[in-house]
A protein has these predicted regions:
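Short phosphate-coordinating micro-motif centered on Lys-Gly-acidic
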Residues: 25-30, 35-77
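Nucleotide and nucleotide-moiety/phosphate-recognizing core
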Residues: 1-25, 31-32, 55-61
Length: 77
C-alpha cells in the first residue's frame, strides 16, 4: 500500500503516510488521488523525489536520516 491514513483519536491531526518508493514516474502521484487525503492533514512522504518532491510547498520540512559514526542522525532542513 502506497498511502496509509491515521486519524484521530490515535493522533492529534490526520496523518497521511505516503511511501513513494514504488512509483516509476512522478506523474503517477495524480493517479493516487493524494490531494483527496491531504486537506487538514500532515503528509509524511518517504522517497519524495519519486513523487517529484515537495520542497516547493509551504510549511515543507525535510528530514533526512543518515548513517553516523554511532548509529544514525536526522538532518532537518
Amino acid at each position: 500500500q502506497i498511502i496509509e491514513v491515521y486519524d484521530p483519536p490515535g493522533v492529534r491531526l490526520p496523518v497521511v503516510h505516503a511511501d513513494f518508493y514504488r512509483l516509476d514516474h512522478p506523474d503517477e502521484v495524480e493517479q493516487l488521488g493524494l490531494d483527496d487525503y491531504r486537506l487538514g492533514a500532515a503528509l509524511l512522504a518517504e522517497w519524495p523525489d519519486h513523487a517529484g518532491g515537495f520542497a516547493h510547498e509551504p510549511a515543507c520540512l525535510s528530514i533526512r536520516i543518515e548513517n553516523a559514526e554511532k548509529g544514525r542522525q536526522a538532518i532537518v532542513e
